[in-house]
């Protein structure tokens, strides 16, 4: 056990010391425009939730049916309250709510384990050869992949209207209606700053854990072209923001 702890500490230190992975990809011409450490396998944190959403939507469940929220992990949704599956997906993609992700995984007809198997099968089918998903929220540092894998995931996710439209909602409300007086919960996007700065973002998902650092995956549409921008392992929120701004202003917008 002590050896395992030491190894995990060494791995975490290596992730923290390494430079961030940065990828800019032109999805219109299928061209990699910028690649920095894009083949490094590292934790992806809540970017995981994009795959969770795709896997759940594949089930074809009635999104207006209600389920009770799972409260075994952190989240803003109220304990022992029922929300529609649609509301859970919104809370997960916009607010990055972990309890929503766990609730959706456990809503699989055959349980959470079957859902995780479906997630990993989908990743392999898409060609995410270096990715593995241990949980549906991204809290686990065993959820790993490369920037190139995440690009592959985004190529699939951008074709799903629900994910595309929901992930860029800046702010909305969800009401817990099980009580006599409904309790309204404000759901604000975890990427509100960049969404306000760049109105060309059409898909967005952030991620943050100590092992993963500050992460973000974006799809932008500019000048009739579609671009994917992935940052993994930035040391701070401000550093992540500066990387995104540098790539958009100095790389993407300088293209012919």
Model-derived regions: residue spans:
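Penicillin-recognizing serine hydrolase domain
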Residues: 17-21, 88, 110-256
